[in-house]
Amino acid sequence: MNTRISFLATLIFGILIVSYSIAGAEDGETLFKSKCGQCHKNGGEAPVFSPVKFASSQWERFFKREKHKRKKDISGIIPSDEQASIKQYLIDHAADSDLPIAAGLQ
């Protein structure tokens, strides 16, 4: 009986973690399109790009060095928690990732 309960608890916990990871990725994608897409679009004030523009280590460096601030400070536009979701989305789908996404903003 205890073995079954432990197994079910572990299974449910695993499903919740996977669901949370998938939801986080979707949030990052949605934020990338809605927030970054305000400027990074065809005819926009910034160039169009996709997650595969850089390798994951390059995205890490981009955010660590706050390179976006050189052109425009986005801290007043995109809160830090949303920036973290966007960063994770870009890293998860970078050129060297297991799930690269070439579709960019339009």
Show the residue positions of the predicted features.
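Electrostatic cytochrome c docking/interface patches
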Residues: 14-31
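Non-transmembrane alpha-helical segments in soluble domains
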Residues: 33, 60-63, 87, 91
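Inter-heme linker and motif-flanking segments adjacent to c-type heme-binding CXXCH motifs
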Residues: 45-48, 97-99
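C-terminal capping alpha-helices of c-type cytochrome domains
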Residues: 76-106
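The canonical Cys-X-X-Cys-His
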Residues: 33-43, 86
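N-terminal, post-signal-peptide region of Sec/Tat-exported proteins
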Residues: 46-81
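Bacterial N-terminal signal peptides that target proteins for export
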Residues: 1-9
